[in-house]
Amino acid sequence: MTAKGLRRIKIKKRIRKYIFGTAERPRLTVFRSNRQIYSQLIDDSTGNTLVVASSLGITEKVSKKKIAYRTGVLVAQKAKEVGIRSVVFDRNGYLYHGRVKELADAAREEGLKF
């Protein structure tokens, strides 16, 4: 693993001590690969994943930031269908910049509170 990857995992473990999702306020976690972006709402008290959204279904040729924005809209819409309005944001060790920020901003604009 690269030094950058090890740094992210170290930050992720440090942050996870303080971030905990419940059924009323689940944890919105983000995973970013080179091509795709994934997000899920997790209830840490039971270990269940409540909602999943990813960029795998988006086939348009647009920028990665626009794809992340659409994924944020998608996860917020799915959360509303389940009845979730408030979440705890877990950036998973990534910097709050670029695609991670776009996903978070889109989820906020669609009505999720965090």
From Swiss-Prot:
GO CC aspect terms: cytosolic large ribosomal subunit
Task: Please name every pair of cysteines joined by a disulfide bond in this record.
Answer: none
The organism's superkingdom is given as Bacteria
Subunit details: Part of the 50S ribosomal subunit; part of the 5S rRNA/L5/L18/L25 subcomplex. Contacts the 5S and 23S rRNAs.
Q: What does the record list as coiled-coil region(s)? A: none
Instruction: Share an example GO biological-process annotation for this protein.
Output: translation
Name the record gives this protein: Large ribosomal subunit protein uL18
Q: Which GO terms describe its molecular function?
A: 5S rRNA binding; structural constituent of ribosome
Q: Which UniProt keywords apply?
A: Ribonucleoprotein, Ribosomal protein, RNA-binding, rRNA-binding
Please report which protein family the annotation says this sequence is part of: Belongs to the universal ribosomal protein uL18 family.
